[in-house]
Curated annotation (Swiss-Prot):
PROSITE patterns, sorted: KAZAL_1, KAZAL_2
Chief place of localization: secreted
Signal peptide: 1-18
Name of this chain's protein: Insoluble matrix shell protein 6
UniProt-listed InterPro entries: Kazal_dom (IPR002350), Kazal_dom_sf (IPR036058)
């Protein structure tokens, strides 16, 4: 009787072990997790049918949906441009004939020395163009892009064949079409 029970337990163990060995965790993930299709992408670039299947295979979630994952690029943030700076051009003329070396007259006529040829009191624009600040770069674990020619221009002025190729290089799209972007 004890031998029959031991053989029965051994047979049940073999059947259970043999029928469930499919996932990395040692279980039949399909039986355990079901067939619902809520796709998730793992950090290793594999698309799983649902989160349970992913966890059953000891993988970690990267995003919802099919692979590859794309994070939408954060908006480009610019620092404000400084105001236009006015630089008047005072000119002091000295008359070398005087002995005491004091200025004989002060003349506010435009001088042609050390200044660009801009009329007096015209604004001389001074801009400090900052580089774009990217907070988030698109994530590409496995770059497989189509050969479509939907040109995009990135913030660094490069034209790519399509947005997927730009994202593979970690570049954010500034506008559709070839560079330079028309405003």
């Amino acid at each position: 009787m004890k031998l029959e029970i031991a053989l029965l337990l051994l047979a049940v163990t073999v059947c259970v072990k043999g029928g469930f060995l499919q996932g990395r965790s040692g279980y039949d993930c399909r039986r355990r997790c079901g067939y619902d299709r809520r796709y998730v992408c793992s950090t290793d670039g594999t698309t799983y049918d649902n989160e349970c299947m992913m966890k059953c295979n000891w993988a970690y979630k990267s995003c919802d949906g099919r692979c590859p994952c794309y994070r939408s690029p954060a908006p480009v943030v610019y620092r404000p441009k400084p105001a236009v700076v006015y630089k008047p051009r005072p000119v002091v003329n000295y008359e070398p004939a005087s002995v005491n070396y004091e200025p004989a007259s002060v003349n506010y006529e435009p001088a042609a020395v050390d200044y660009p040829s801009v009329p007096d009191y015209e604004p001389i624009p001074v801009y400090n163009e900052p580089a774009p600040v990217y907070y988030d770069v698109p994530v590409q674990s496995d770059c497989v892009c189509s050969k479509d020619k939907d040109y995009v221009c990135t913030y660094d002025g490069e034209t790519y064949d399509n947005e997927c190729e730009a994202n593979c290089d970690g570049k954010a799209k500034m506008c559709d079409g070839q560079c330079p972007c028309s405003k």
